[in-house]
């Protein structure tokens, strides 16, 4: 059976970016495992459950129900205990929370590196989780993302979320902006700001811009599998 690992934030994952790929893969018969940095259940960003952000009342209710009741989401594995070679795909959903935990986690970075470096695996990285690409390096120190085509959460959108001191509404200071770090690491960045969705495929690395691209990203991943 085809197997996929989801690496989800405990600091605030974006519901659509996790749940759309999760339900799409499960509906296609893919065996899904959930992992978080510590092994505690992931924490959804409440902003992503607002009907306006979720795409309507029905979608918001569905996301809230799945977050609360999905057995695997509520009983994850610690990242340090899973092996990339056990999975055909590794998925990194976004959400601002990833900038504080998943993107900075050495075991998460190793999972990504091993997935993309191998011959069989494929990685899907969404929205703010794309920041992990800036901090994942090959054995010789070369950034994994160097010269790769990617999309992700753009500065143009971040400007509308943080204040002049990079603080979010909840008071947390954003430690870095995804686009800045990924470009600095040598990526060929294009968030396709004029397009309704943005999904970029570069070999065994799939990246998606944000929530509105989650469905297309899931379909692209299924095609790759």
Enumerate the language-model features and the residues they cover:
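Extended, subdomain-level signal for the structured scaffold at the beginning of enzyme domains
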Residues: 1-120, 132-225
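Short, thiol/selenol-centered motifs that function as redox-active sites or metal-ligating centers
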Residues: 125-130
């Amino acid at each position: 059976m085809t197997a996929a690992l989801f690496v989800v934030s405990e600091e605030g994952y974006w519901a659509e970016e996790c749940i759309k790929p999760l339900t799409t893969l499960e509906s296609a018969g893919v065996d899904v495992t959930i992992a978080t940095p510590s092994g505690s259940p992931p924490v959804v960003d409440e902003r992503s459950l607002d009907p306006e952000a979720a795409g309507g009342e029905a979608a918001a209710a569905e996301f809230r129900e799945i977050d609360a009741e999905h057995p695997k989401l509520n009983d994850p594995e610690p990242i340090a205990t899973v092996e990339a070679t056990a999975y055909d795909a590794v998925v990194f959903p976004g959400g601002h929370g990833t900038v504080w935990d998943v993107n900075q986690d050495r075991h998460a970075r190793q999972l990504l590196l091993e997935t993309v470096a191998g011959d069989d695996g494929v990685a899907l990285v969404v929205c703010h989780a794309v920041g992990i690409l800036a901090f994942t390096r090959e054995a010789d120190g070369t950034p994994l993302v160097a010269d790769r085509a990617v999309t992700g959460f753009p500065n143009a959108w971040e400007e509308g979320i943080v204040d002049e001191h990079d603080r979010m509404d909840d008071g947390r200071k954003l430690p870095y902006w995804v686009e800045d770090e990924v470009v600095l690491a040598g990526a060929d960045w294009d968030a396709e700001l004029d397009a309704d969705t943005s999904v970029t495929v570069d070999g065994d690395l799939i990246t998606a811009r944000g929530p509105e691209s989650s469905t297309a990203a899931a379909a692209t991943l299924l095609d790759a599998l």
